[in-house]
Amino acid sequence: MHIGVAGNIGSGKTTLTRMLAEHYGWKPQFESVTYNPYLEDYYKDIPRWSYNLETYFLAQRFRDVLEISKSKETIIQDRTISEGVYIFVANNYEMGNLSDRDYQTYMQLFELMMSTVKQPDLLIYLKSGIEHLVANIQKRGREYEQSISIEYLDGLNRHYEQWISKYTGPLLIVETDNIDFKNNPEDFAAITDRIDAQLFGLF
């Protein structure tokens, strides 16, 4: 089984992925940012490095999806392959950070890849407001993220909402602005109760 956790930068995806993996005994698959050779340059000059960064991420996510499809374990994934395309690439293209030529080349690659993979058995979307995202980004203190603009985050949020509104697979939306699932066991239990109901038909 494949569980995907989706959400904007700073929404708590990695934290929730780790907690759910521990709770259910699932195997977590985290998106690696440590070894992306473009990430630091990207946040310094987004137009220059958008195509390089997004193509690198696409290759990594496709590799992850292929591994998940072959696994007999239940895997919970931090960020799905579709997010890279419908959120980050779409936002960069809209903002003029990707040329028409680069965008079309990227989409051709993505469409070829998607012909071989399927949607997660459940997608958990962490819906977060800008203030919540900014607070989390500042709190975790990653240097390369401190230059992210409000405009950029807002564009990502808008594309997330558009994508989720058209999503056709099994979906669970968690609004994160007024909960603290990391530190409040009741908030985390409320999420797992909803997952139990969706996956296992438990009340």
What do these predicted regions represent?
Residues 5:
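Hydrophobic anchor at the beta1->P-loop junction of P-loop NTPases
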Residues 13:
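Conserved lysine of the Walker
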Residues 22-60:
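Conserved substrate/cofactor phosphate-moiety recognition/catalytic segment
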Residues 61-101:
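A basic- and aromatic-enriched beta-loop-alpha substructure that forms the phosphate/nucleotide-
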Residues 134-203:
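NTP-dependent small-molecule kinase module
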